[in-house]
């Protein structure tokens, strides 16, 4: 049941009681409805259907006359079973109702609605409340109290604080009656101010023709500037695209060139590797050395030496060595083809005899004693000193000749030394079964060759310190050369073997 049906019902039965002979009908309806509201305080679908059926039965005679004022509401047909249900509830309504009082009642309700017209604000509030109520389906909004936009119905004549259906219909009819008549005036009122953004209207009412012309010129100028900006962006994009394509083509060409060079390099390396195994020239160059007088010389000296003497026999007549004069082999880096032909800084090779001739003869130092070992070998010219050294090389006892002796000596097993006083007695000196007891006149002092006692140890020493006497300078030692002064290692060792 819509709000229009409520409006019609209230206009017919609530506000026009003196004009309609239905006071008893309303009394019976309120009595039956009061009992229903106690058990069902809300407006249920069953109650709504019963009200629609009752209104359809009452308005069947005047349906054609009031279709234009019902906002497109079509009253459904009356069903017999619905009427029976209403009679069973004690809500029977007599059907002998004349059409004339109803028509007068409808006209009177319209007149009252027009006199009690409200402002546009009340109409907007009512519309907002109705939309909120119809969209919300919660139990709080289906109640009759919340249905009236928060207005609580308190202290009615029949209900007394209870949610009375009659009071609900009266409140709704008051708002709807004023809204139905004032809808035409609401359409003709001024439009409210815009609350949000959005595009400006095409034409303002208070704009002069000059301002309109300026606006048109400004819009045209903005359009042209936007078109130029778009064209500039398109041109720049096209230029960048062309540049990228050119760079990609260049990259492809360079990649192909690199691949071609790599392939040629591999082919050359393969040919070189296969040629080295069968090349005869490399084998001959590995053994050829270009020399000049026993030294590696540049090409200039080689050519001069080969033209003047028989040095050409040492010169290899091939392309590598004849021009460079270098050692050739497997490594090509030794070949100095790209080097300059400037002569090397080499000293000329001279004979040893010519070098000995330039040695200056110096007199011997008078301070050297005649008994010195250096006095035995005077230096003579023309290499005679070498012959003297070789002739005297048989003497192995002289410490000065040991340095000149080139014959390898056998390494001794013990350290040779001499006893100072000869008081050490060997118990096995005459034992011929043992090994040799002397090496070059030096007795071998080992545990296997002699027996030591306390007397011999105290007489000869403990063997931990040198047993030679103190070094007393004499006239001969003072006059000797500094190289001939007695040192612990200048003569055969005087240390006891450990």
Swiss-Prot record:
Composition-biased stretches, type Low complexity, lie in: 135-144, 177-191, 304-325
User: Biased composition, Polar residues: where in the chain?
Assistant: 108-127, 333-343
State the protein's name. Transcription factor kayak
Residue ranges for the region (Basic motif) are 214-233
Q: According to the UniProt record, where is the region Disordered? A: 108-144, 177-234, 304-345, 465-498
Keyword terms: Activator, DNA-binding, Nucleus, Phosphoprotein, Transcription, Transcription regulation
Q: Which family does it belong to?
A: Belongs to the bZIP family. Fos subfamily.
Modified residues annotated as Phosphoserine in this record: 342
> Pfam families given for it?
bZIP_1 (PF00170)
């Amino acid at each position: 049941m819509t709000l229009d049906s409520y409006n019609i019902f209230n206009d017919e039965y609530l506000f026009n009681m003196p004009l309609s002979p239905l006071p008893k009908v309303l009394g019976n309806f309120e009595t039956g409805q009061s009992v229903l509201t106690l058990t069902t305080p809300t407006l249920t679908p069953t109650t709504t259907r019963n009200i629609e059926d009752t209104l359809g039965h009452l308005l069947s005679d005047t349906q054609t006359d009031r279709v234009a004022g019902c906002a497109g509401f079509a009253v459904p047909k009356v069903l017999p079973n619905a009427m029976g249900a209403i009679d069973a509830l004690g809500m029977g309504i007599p059907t002998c109702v004349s059409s004339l009082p109803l028509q007068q009642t409808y006209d009177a309700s319209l007149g009252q609605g027009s006199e009690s017209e409200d402002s546009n604000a009340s109409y907007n509030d009512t519309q907002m409340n109705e939309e909120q109520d119809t969209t919300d389906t919660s139990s709080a909004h289906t109640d009759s109290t919340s249905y009236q936009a928060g207005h609580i119905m308190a202290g009615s004549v029949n209900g007394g604080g209870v949610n009375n259906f009659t009071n609900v219909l009266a409140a709704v009819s008051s708002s709807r009656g004023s809204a139905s008549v004032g809808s035409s005036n609401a359409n003709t009122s001024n439009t409210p101010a815009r609350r949000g953004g959005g595009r400006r209207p095409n034409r303002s009412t208070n704009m002069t023709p000059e301002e309109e012309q300026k606006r048109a010129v400004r819009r045209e100028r903005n359009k042209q500037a936007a078109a130029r900006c778009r064209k500039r962006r398109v041109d720049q994009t096209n230029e960048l695209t062309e540049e990228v394509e050119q760079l990609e083509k260049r990259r492809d060409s360079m990649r192909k060139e690199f691949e071609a060079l790599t392939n040629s390099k591999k082919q050359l390396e393969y040919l070189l590797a296969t040629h080295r195994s069968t090349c005869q020239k490399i084998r001959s160059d590995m053994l050829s050395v270009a020399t000049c007088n026993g030294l590696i010389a540049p090409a200039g000296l080689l050519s001069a030496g080969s033209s003047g003497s028989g040095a050409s026999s040492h010169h290899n007549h091939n392309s590598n060595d004849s021009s460079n004069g270098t050692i050739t082999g497997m490594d090509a880096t030794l070949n100095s083809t790209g080097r300059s032909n400037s002569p090397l800084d080499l000293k000329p090779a001279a004979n040893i005899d010519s070098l000995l001739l330039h040695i200056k003869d110096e007199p011997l130092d008078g301070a050297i004693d005649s008994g010195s070992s250096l006095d035995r070998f005077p230096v003579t010219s023309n290499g005679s000193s070498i012959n003297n050294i070789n002739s005297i090389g048989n003497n192995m006892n002289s410490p000065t000749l040991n340095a000149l002796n080139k014959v390898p000596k056998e390494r001794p097993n013990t350290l040779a030394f001499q006893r100072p006083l000869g008081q050490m007695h060997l118990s096995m000196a005459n034992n011929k079964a043992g090994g040799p007891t002397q090496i070059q006149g030096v007795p071998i002092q080992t545990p296997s060759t002699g027996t030591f006692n306390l007397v011999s140890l105290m007489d000869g020493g403990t063997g931990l310190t040198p047993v030679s006497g103190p070094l007393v300078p004499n006239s001969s030692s003072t006059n000797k050369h500094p190289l001939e002064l007695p040192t612990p290692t200048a003569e055969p060792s005087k240390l006891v073997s450990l």
